[in-house]
Amino acid sequence: MSEKMVAIMKTKPEYGAELVEVDVPKPGPGEVLIKILATSICGTDLHIYEWNEWAQTRIRPPQIMGHEVAGEVVEVGPGVEGIEVGDYVSVETHIVCGKCYACKRGQYHVCQNTKIFGVDTDGVFAEYAVVPAQNVWKNPKNIPPEYATLQEPLGNAVDTVLAGPIAGKSVLITGAGPLGLLGIAVAKASGAYPVIVSEPSEFRRNLAKKVGADYVINPFEEDVVKEVMDITDGNGVDVFLEFSGAPKALEQGLQAVTPAGRVSLLGLFPGKVSIDFNNLIIFKALTVYGITGRHLWETWYTVSRLLQSGKLNIDPIITHKYKGFDKYEEAFELMRAGKTGKVVFMLK
């Protein structure tokens, strides 16, 4: 193994990133070194690349970017048990303390001292990466790397869709970005019908159809609530899944969901949102879930089994694959333009 590696690094507190050569890291106690086989771009990575307000308060350059990954263990640090060289793995990004009130109740996904791998630490946009052993997930060999790298965001989608019963339920999904597209795939694989998708981008509406959406709506040109009511015989949808983070989409979804229906919110909104709680939530007796992270490790088991079942139609979601990191700037600019689903760097 070479002592040097290539990595996409946020070198300066400004727009963009650089492709650099750095030393291959060494695993310390409780850590493993993995060789990257595939890694995918997340919206968080795009925020770091763009150097938005959130990134400016959270990221401390120089830092290797990336956190969605599939790889092979090539070295194990002192004190690590249950993980061996040659294991095919992915990584849970939430590094939890195990000591706080939430962790002691088994609610690791809301650990009060969470650090994010690839945000608060160096990440996986590199040929090798050091990972906390406690965050390693062993993959079955029959899941290809370009799928295995998607398990972290797929876990977000699974928790959003499966927060309540979904089989045989009518569903409205607002936002068909990468996470919304994964949500469509999970809903269809889990027996939802019809799955209605509201998305302003024609490119993403077409992707939604390919993934399995039964109806697509352009919210800029059509009345979302009217369309949903027409499709559902005036009843509204049983389940509303919000992936966009758009306040208007939230309001439309709450209007379109049936009384005593279920709502799952994953999209992040730009600040405070004004909602008529009395008429849209309380008097409708809605059950509303806020979704963050993934349940450790229940969600990972669900994701892995869904992938192994062959029922998840995620091929259309992976719109761009790059061999290595050389065209990383093109990849990020395409994502900025909204012209991608998931973008995967293949290093195998």
UniProtKB/Swiss-Prot annotation:
Residues holding NAD(+): L179, E199, R204, L266, G267, L268, I291, T292
Cellular location(s): Cytoplasm
List of residues binding Zn(2+) 1: C42, H67, E68
A GO molecular function held by the record: zinc ion binding
Cofactor: Zn(2+)
Keywords of the record: Cytoplasm, Metal-binding, NAD, Oxidoreductase, Zinc
Cellular component aspect of the GO annotation: cytoplasm
Principal subcellular localisation of the protein: cytoplasm
EC number(s) from the headed UniProt entry: 1.1.1.103
Catalytic activity: L-threonine + NAD(+) = (2S)-2-amino-3-oxobutanoate + NADH + H(+)
Protein's job: Catalyzes the NAD(+)-dependent oxidation of L-threonine to 2-amino-3-ketobutyrate. To a lesser extent, also catalyzes the oxidation of L-serine, D-threonine, butan-2,3-diol, butan-1,2-diol, and propan-1,2-diol and cannot oxidize other L-amino acids. Cannot utilize NADP(H) instead of NAD(H).
Similarity field: Belongs to the zinc-containing alcohol dehydrogenase family.
HAMAP family on file: Thr_dehydrog (MF_00627)
Subunit note: Homotetramer.
Name listed for the protein in its UniProt record: L-threonine 3-dehydrogenase
Source species: Pyrococcus furiosus (strain ATCC 43587 / DSM 3638 / JCM 8422 / Vc1)
